[in-house]
Amino acid sequence: MVLCMKYDKLTQKKSVLDRCRPLHSDIVRNLDDWFRVELTYTSNAIEGNTLTRRETALVVEKGLTVGGKSLTEHLEATNHASALDWVKEKVAATQKNISEKDILKIHDVILKGIDDHNSGQYRNVSVRISGSAVVLPNHAKVSYLMEEFADWLATDNDIHPVEFAAEAHYRLVTIHPFTDGNGRTARLLMNMILLMSGYPPAIIRKRDRLKYITALETAQLGGSKEAYLKLIAKAVDRSLDIYIKAVKGEDAEQENGDTLLKIGELAKAVGEANSTIRHWTKEGLLEVSDITDSGYHLYATDTIERIKQIHVLKKKRLTLQEIKRHLT
């Protein structure tokens, strides 16, 4: 029910954006340029690339070399940007179903010059996800599973486009058909589906990396997909807001910033004790965006707004469980 409401909200926001089409060419160009850098930066950062957002922009937009960074990190940036360009060209040229060939093409561009032997090729070895209990399919089954996956992609379905895109991402990373580049390929596939459906791309923020990986793993180990599907829906929601605010002439690009607050900083900002923040986190009212090497919780800046909402609801004498249900 909660997810259905979220998808209804996305449909409504898309309708608002659709009523503004065609967008002015300057707005389209600015958004395309920003999303190109942001998607490249975040997708690579999730996989461990150390280029900052600014460095990624210099590499992708200016073709510059950043001192102290490896050739592979530079190639990961330029390759992802090129793969995204190909995806957008494909979307603009046709509305046909996505094929295995398309997925292999995305992967080929992602690993170009990094691992030419395996780029655009299904794996022929067994692989594991480092630090995860998820057991991936035997390499002998990959070709069959990908054929089955492509058939599923081509099948008419009645689920919401955002859920369909998220499910496609989930299924591809669970098959894990490549030796490397599975996550980046899956996120580009997801965004290809979103673009084909008239939605903006979903950006998985660097600060959401832990939630993203945990939600995926929970589902892959037989648990609920709800947290994962909510995360993707929220990412699309943010992108819709960015587009709508751009049309209105408002600056929304900073919404994907990576500033994280320590518990003391958050507590001071909202006038609460550290112990209260810890308690609300334990009760599920607040989400931890990341954890330091020392085990300290870090919170996104938008947690401040959530706590303000909690304050309002507490004044109405709602219990913590009632507040949690209200905010979900």
Task: For the regions a language model picked out, list residue spans one by one.
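Aromatic-rich, solvent-exposed beta-strand/loop patch
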Residues: 300
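FIC/Doc superfamily catalytic core
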Residues: 1-180, 184-288, 292-297, 306, ...
